């Protein structure tokens, strides 16, 4: 764990202690999958008597906040995250916008990545999961992405019907080295995939791995 990761974990533990001390729910910024895993290991046997849940808007969300609630506080205090729908004003003339386009538009509004969760692009529209505190600002100011004029509005979670597409792959490999596993997943030889690993394009549980021989077991 580097110094920055140590600071993040310490801050998250401070939030838990503040929740316990004040008797009021507390939520963190959005965390990467790696930061979530680091904190779970860091906080073992250190958390005060509060309930903790990781919330990202849907079951398989990658980016999540940590939401603490005092003992006895129930669902009357939902996690402080909001769901936004972004659609082109004129679908006929809209561009094929990518995840990078939507994220770039948010960055151009001065919004930190820590305030945004997953961005789900579906056809000509996208869903943005964001911190509750900035939802209104985004709806008012996100009016254009690249050359496409858009409308952004907050919607109820009941309107969110997204199920990530996953593919189960089965096979046999000689070892559980990283290059062997992704070779099986993408049906390519180890030699063709080593470049992806060395170029930091491969993650394991949210952490970038640059060693072909990394053992996944």
Descriptions of predicted regions:
Residues 1-185:
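Ferredoxin-like alpha/beta domains used as RNA- or RNAP-binding modules
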Residues 169-216:
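A basic, amphipathic helix-loop patch mediating RNA/tRNA/ribosome contacts
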